[in-house]
């Protein structure tokens, strides 16, 4: 419930009174479970990350190959970010640096490792170009996440986050895929990649 409130109103504008009222508890009860608003946000971020990790691992397990896995994870990300105002991330960085750092650590460890593994898998499956350096491409991909969420680069609501992710996926998957990979995409995902 608190995550919904944060997503709708932003981290900065949600007060302790709002949280207690929305959760249907007194502020006193709230403080029994959480030290302060920062503690709640940190806990919420950690729970969200744990949930997303499991979903990404499920996508990787269910994917028949690297392309299916990448598209499946991207679909999940698009769904999660479809109506998120990027200023939410700015607020998190400015007003809740500990929670922001947890997100950054997650991005540079878990997301990086998954992208790196996906690239290696795609090369091994002969779906991705063999002349790619997985370390460089994975680092580029992770670094581009901040740009996708930057209100200076992509002012909201002119650029919706789900649209940005779709365009970046289209751009990246075509850059990763070799001829065999592009053929596979056209046969299996042409509508999705080009919609």
What are these regions (language model features)?
Residues 5-43:
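Helix-turn-helix
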Residues 68, 106, 124-140, 158-163, ...:
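All-alpha amphipathic helical-bundle segments outside canonical DNA-binding/catalytic cores
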Residues 37, 48, 52, 73, ...:
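Hydrophobic/aromatic residues within well-ordered alpha-helical segments
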Residues 82-117, 124-128, 132-136:
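Short secondary-structure transition hinges
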């Amino acid at each position: 419930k608190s995550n919904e409130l944060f997503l709708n109103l932003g981290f900065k504008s949600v007060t302790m009174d709002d949280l207690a009222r929305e959760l249907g508890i007194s502020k006193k009860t709230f403080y029994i479970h959480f030290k302060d608003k920062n503690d709640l946000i940190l806990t919420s971020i950690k729970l969200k990350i744990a949930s997303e990790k499991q979903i990404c691992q499920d996508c990787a397990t269910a994917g028949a190959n690297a392309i299916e896995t990448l598209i499946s994870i991207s679909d999940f990300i698009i769904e999660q970010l479809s109506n998120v105002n990027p200023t939410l991330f700015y607020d998190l960085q400015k007003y809740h640096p500990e929670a922001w750092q947890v997100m950054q650590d997650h991005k540079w460890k878990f997301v990086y490792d998954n992208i790196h593994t996906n690239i290696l898998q795609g090369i091994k499956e002969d779906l991705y170009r063999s002349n790619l350096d997985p370390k460089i491409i994975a680092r580029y991909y992770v670094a581009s996440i901040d740009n996708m969420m930057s209100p200076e680069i992509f002012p909201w609501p002119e650029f919706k986050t789900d649209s940005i992710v779709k365009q970046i996926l289209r751009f990246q998957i075509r850059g990763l895929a070799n001829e065999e990979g592009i053929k596979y995409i056209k046969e299996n995902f042409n509508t999705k990649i080009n919609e």
